[in-house]
Amino acid sequence: MGNPRPRPMRLAEKLLQIRTGLGLSQTQMLERLGLGDTMHYGRISEYEQDKREPTLMTLLAYARAASVHLEDIVDDDFELPRKLPGNVNYRGINRKSRK
């Protein structure tokens, strides 16, 4: 079956950086992730304090919310951008289509 993957050592730090970089509270982060109906905001705190590891689907939601690659979040060798671009499609803001 293969070897288990090593746990990212900087995951909690990066998840906190994403939330604060987007200027969101923990409750707002849940809403931004689309998880407000299925998860309590305390779970965000557990992720940020390295008390719980998020699921792959949650990590993908973080990557979408911050408009970064999943590898930027889970690979300790990659850094998140200082200024997060955020999701330009969030709340009805649409990108201009290229012709």
Show where each model-derived region lies.
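A short, Lys/Arg-rich alpha-helix, primarily the initiator
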Residues: M1-L22
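Short, charged recognition helix plus adjacent turn
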Residues: G2-R5, R64, V74-K99
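Residue-level signal for the short linker/turn that defines the boundary of a DNA-recognition helix
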Residues: R10-E13, G23-L24, M39, P54-M57
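Residue-level recognition of specific faces of alpha-helices
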Residues: K14, R43-E46, D72
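Key DNA-contact positions within bacterial/archaeal DNA-binding proteins
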Residues: T27, T38, G42, E71
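Short alpha-helical "recognition helix" segments of helix-turn-helix
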Residues: M29-L33, Y62
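Recognition helix of helix-turn-helix/homeodomain-like DNA-binding domains
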Residues: G34-E53
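DNA major-groove recognition helix of helix-turn-helix/homeodomain DNA-binding modules
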Residues: K51, T55-D72
